[in-house]
């Protein structure tokens, strides 16, 4: 089972490396999810803009709500005008239409759909503001000391920050607490 989780964490590290320009590579951390051993790192605690890695916290909170029964995978949630107005990438559903939590999670994590981050936030907590408050409370509870969220999709806001270390911890927590949802990360 430990080898099963190594691939997503290694992929997260590779994506971070590939997304950064060669001359100005961003902070990074690569660790073994089974043991927690850090294999290599560069400025892992340095604050930086998380972009779409924000969606990992969005997914984590949704996974917690699925576990407690607050949400169900087959539950339909409405697309609000606010969710529909999010910048691309998005799937572009019309306000008032409905989507299952399962499909919203798939499009959030596979296509990085910004509109689905808002749909899930509103479906889970009623408002994006309340969801973001929960994101920050959860980050604090997990010890993500360099992390502060302003929105659930990662669209740019200079106040939205994290670190490679914090994202690594969050990824490991997701894999440890919710192995049943690992398929969302391998599509």
Where do the language-model regions lie?
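Bacterial N-terminal signal peptides
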Residues: 9-19
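Active-site-adjacent loops and short helices of periplasmic peptidoglycan-processing enzymes
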Residues: 17, 21-165, 172-179
